[in-house]
Swiss-Prot record:
Transmembrane regions listed in the UniProt entry: none
Post-translational modification: Contains 2 disulfide bonds that can be either 'C1-C3, C2-C4' or 'C1-C4, C2-C3', since these disulfide connectivities have been observed for conotoxins with cysteine framework V (for examples, see AC P0DQQ7 and AC P81755).
Protein name per its UniProtKB record: Conotoxin Vn5.3
One CC-aspect GO term: extracellular region
Tissue: Expressed by the venom duct.
Record remark on domains: The cysteine framework is V (CC-CC).
Organism: Conus ventricosus
Protein localization: Secreted
Family in the record: Belongs to the conotoxin T superfamily.
KW Secreted (keyword) present: yes
Keyword presence, Secreted: yes
Highest taxon in the source lineage: Eukaryota
Lineage of producing organism: Eukaryota, Metazoa, Spiralia, Lophotrochozoa, Mollusca
Signal peptide: 1-19
Amino acid sequence: MRCLPVFVILLLLIASAPGVDVQPKTKYYVPRASRRDFAKKTPKRLSKLRGCCPRSFLCCR
């Protein structure tokens, strides 16, 4: 029964803690959707830079 008051106090402290993001959004933060779009656009950019070649698997997509 000694642990019950300590447990209640800990619950009250946790409940009153502010809801703050642990990891702040910095200039390096990239959402997952942007990563997917970047992965789709990269082969197109490479094919435009090098021109279309039949031996490369990244060309002409």
